Amino acid sequence: MSGASPTRGFVPGDVVPGAQNAPAFTDAADLLLDSTGLQQASGTPGLLLLADGTRYEGKLFGSEGIAQGELVFTTGMCGYQESMTDPSFAGQVLTFTWPLLGNYGILPGISESAGVHPRGIVCRQVMKIPDHRDSVGSVHEFLAVHGVPGIEGIDTRALTRRVREHGTVLCVFGPKERSDEMKEILSGMTPPDAEDLVASVTCEEAVLLNQGAQDDEGEPLPRLAAIDCGIKYNILRELCKRFEVVWCPASLDFDSIISEWHPDALFASNGPGAPAHPGDAASARESLAAAVRAEMPVMGICLGHQLMGLAAGLRTYKLRYGHRGANQPVVDLQTGRVDITSQNHGFAVEDPDKGMLACLLYTSDAADDTPCV
């Protein structure tokens, strides 16, 4: 990630208190507007190495250098800019299963954060000259200004099948001529789940986004403390339509949240890494548990939901390859109805009684019979 700030992309001076003022955020695409003299992708021969010994050859684009992380894939046909700027992908090398990446370029105002969070991008083909009237640059240029490498020309179908069959795997890619260096890096890699990834993406200080927010009848909206475990901009925007939102770092303890901000409810966001990690994720988990003890309403999305499960005494576990993309089938366990959903998570809450969570969630993933959250 690049372009971080104490409030991770929030611009306080651009917000006027009141119900009709949406928060303003620094978009990851803004760096392209300030950049000049960017070079086209060099097409340097590249090499992708997996920890199981599998290797793929391709061509490099984006930032020069070596990328390393946990290899995962996402199945969306579009929305690549939102995926690349989603903090939940921190620590990972992101593969796009759709064969063409970047056909409409990079658009202003649609990023989910101020930076690019995957440590590397893998695709079949990257569009060199995007075709959209609002585009401010190509995917290559976008990754280059954010310091993130990419590799194209990879058989992503074979790569995806490998991950589906055997699970996520550590990987490294970079210039083919540096293969010996990459092998050495790969041999010493540890899973990113061991890192405090939440600490790397959370904001550094609490800020009130929409002070004085009101509903359509002029009544004050309830105040929500949103714990930032890697929250996406669009979640903040949607919350601000319904609440007066305090954007809080994951490390901020519950007593401080209550004494300084006096919220009516607590929310825990999406984010990267293992929910049982002892770092900032544990701090957020403790705040959720304290809120429950105080009989305060709580809610969680993605990692936030997993933290709620841990706070309630349940356990979480890592999915074999995760659920990432816009076409994830989910079945309602009460009615049998199947919906196609957008998901992005690599962990789930364990259902020890094979039915205890059904009354709470009503849903289970139809693709591999695992919980959808």
Label for each model-derived stretch:
Residues 2-3, 8-255:
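RNA-binding accessory domains that recognize and position tRNA/RNA substrates
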Residues 353-361:
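Short, intrinsically disordered, charge-balanced linker/junction segments flanking boundaries
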Residues 242-243, 283-286, 358:
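Glycine-rich, phosphate-binding/catalytic loops in enzymes
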Residues 362-367:
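Conserved small/polar residues in nucleotide/adenosyl-binding loops
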Residues 260, 265, 269-352:
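Cysteine-nucleophile active-site neighborhood
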